Amino acid sequence: DTCRRQRQMCIRDRCVKEDIIIIMQAANTGLTGGSTPYGDDYERPVIVLNTMRIDDIHIINDGKQIIGLTGSTLYNLEKKLKPYKREPHSIIGSTSIGASIIGGICNNAGGSLVQRGPSYTQMALYAKINKNGKLELVNELDINLGSSPEEILSNLQNKNYKKSDIKNTGKLGSDDKYPEIIRKINEDTPSRFNSDSRLLYGASGSAGKLAVFAVRLDTYRSPKENKVFYVGTNDPDVFWKIRRDILSKFKTLPTLGDYLHRDCYDAAKKYSKDTFLVIERLGTTFLPTLFELKRRVDILAKKLKFFPDNFSDRLMQFLSNFWPNHLPKRMENFRDLYEHHWVIEMSDEGIVEAEKYFSEIFKNQDGDYFICNEFESKKASLHRFVSASAIGRYHILNSKNHGDMMSLDIAFPRNEKNWFEKLPKEIDELLSLIHI
């Protein structure tokens, strides 16, 4: 009975004893490949553990903090926090596609978030393999849940704890240093980068090396108003100046900032169109069904030899060609006018600051801007988000003509001026699609 109630811990314990590789999987929504086995050269047997059925979210400390269990999603957290006028760490993109709370913590997600920085907490409940090779449950939630693994997991899942069991010891439930770090524009180090030791703590940044059962996180006050500024230029130095001015002079930092090169814009428009339309029109509830349909279609296509590989992707790409242009006219006009695009979201007092700044700077600098209406805001943010999947779709459709796909995630120093890389001609000519 205990093993049935604590099935996940028991499965992990058995896998450790049998020397089986465990791949933790939550929403599996990564547009560039999620938590799935890759290749056929693993040295040991592999098991994939999906956690989505354990999706409870506990609101604590009057909505200022939450406890997210292993399969809880940002989408559901956003809904639960609305009555408290609070928001989760990530509200763009990740919530749209149903990503998990814990997946973000394990990968320090939040690359475009300026005010909030990377996902981070020092409070979590997780299992690790100790120095003796045994599975060990570690409770760093700062909540009194009992002593034995069975008791801790049962009390947490059943919310069997009192307000007095919740300790407030000063441990962090978010990255409180990032706004200060990102404003230091003359430093010769990046503001954020992979495997930053500052952000590696327990579950945070663990990236699959731990089995995480729950995390305790801070929430954020919902702004009264948001506005998206769509900015374009043909001169990379203009964006360099804007970035420095905003980070060093604005009283209110942007909520987020997302860059697109014209090539990226075009690739996303063509190769991520179906993903865009599915998320926009059917929402997250249909995504699991869509993924399952794609999987079944590909299995069937493999049995029928006259169908090509990755048939579902090829079919969706073909059908998307019949759908009319899904992007707003003003975005399309900027695509024709400008090579470099920037989606900047401001909130509350920052809106007036940004409007005054942009109306002045483009009087004597190359480029222009417009303030998105609600329709354009959603389209611009979603277009940037789905662009991550475009290179994968392109590679699938053209795999016979090209070599492997290579992804580079580059963290520039904060004082870097020459941020836009111009490749040597002999290299540039060998590349079929550069996706920035």
How should each PLM-predicted stretch be described?
Residues 29, 65, 71-77, 100-101:
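Short, structural beta-strand-to-alpha-helix junction motif
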Residues 12-15, 20-24, 31-40, 45, ...:
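Transmitter module of two-component histidine kinases
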Residues 58, 75, 82-240:
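FAD-binding subdomain of flavoenzyme oxidoreductases
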Residues 1-7, 11, 434-435:
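Single conserved hydrophobic/aromatic residue that forms the stacking wall/gate
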